[in-house]
Every structure is written in structure tokens, then in C-alpha cells.
């Protein structure tokens, strides 16, 4: 991910939304560097449930390493981040959801894409909401 291209895209933006795959740690570093260079402080970063070993009955799996490593880079930054750790995606209609904080057991398993989208918009448009937090989200 080219930092200069990110800087151009971030010009004049208040919020940066990142939902990535691939070399997530490198991409997270590029995002943090670009945000420092250009000025936006607010980052909404999509990760995955289980990155802290917080899913009851599930062992941590190495497939989550890119999500955990990129979240650690974001958490070490001085940005006003929110890391969102969704459950498995469904195409169900929007509905009520449960949030869990880092260090709490993850509740539920699935999250509808409509519900997740609504939460992301709420976070992006509500100053201070879940700033410097990592939240798990699943349908009730």
C-alpha cells in the first residue's frame, strides 16, 4: 500500500475507514504513517473476532496473526482509533447487537452486514464514540 497515494486520498478527510486483507501489518503501518503526515486522527479499523483469544471454547489460531498484528500496530499509535472485531458475516436484516470490550469474552458468533454497517456509520459520525477501544460485535 503506497503511503503517498494514501496521503492524497486522506487530504481533507475527518475519518479513515480501513477494512483490509493481505499484508495487514504493512498496510496498517502505511495507514498510520499517512494519517500522521496528512492530519486525520480518527481511524475505524476492521479486524476479526478471536484476535485476543477471547472467543469462549475456541483456541487462538495462527490464521488470525495478520489481524492481531495489525491491531497491535494501531493500538500502539497515537490515533483516535476504534478497532471493530466482528463475528462471522450474515446477510440477515439489521437488528440488535452485542458489544464486548477487549479482555471480555466474545458474545455471540454472527453479525449481519447491515447491522455492522450501521454501527460503523454511528462510530464515524459520533465524535468520541469508542475512541481508543477495540470492540467485538455480534448479533444478539
Model-derived regions: residue spans:
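A short acidic, amphipathic alpha-helical/loop segment
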Residues: 30-34
Amino acid at each position: 500500500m503506497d503511503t503517498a497515494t494514501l496521503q492524497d486520498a486522506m487530504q481533507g478527510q475527518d475519518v479513515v475507514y480501513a477494512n483490509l486483507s493481505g499484508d495487514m501489518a504493512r498496510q496498517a503501518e502505511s495507514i498510520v504513517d499517512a494519517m500522521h503526515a496528512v492530519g486525520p486522527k480518527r481511524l475505524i479499523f476492521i479486524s476479526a473476532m478471536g484476535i485476543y483469544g477471547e472467543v469462549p471454547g475456541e483456541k487462538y489460531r495462527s490464521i488470525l496473526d495478520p489481524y492481531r498484528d495489525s491491531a497491535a500496530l494501531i493500538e500502539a499509535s497515537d490515533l483516535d482509533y476504534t478497532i471493530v472485531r466482528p463475528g462471522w458475516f450474515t446477510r440477515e436484516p439489521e437488528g440488535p447487537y452485542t458489544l464486548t470490550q477487549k479482555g471480555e469474552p466474545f458474545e455471540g458468533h454472527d453479525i449481519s452486514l447491515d447491522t455492522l454497517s450501521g454501527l460503523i456509520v454511528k462510530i464515524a459520525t459520533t465524535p468520541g464514540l469508542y475512541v481508543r477501544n477495540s470492540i467485538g460485535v455480534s448479533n444478539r
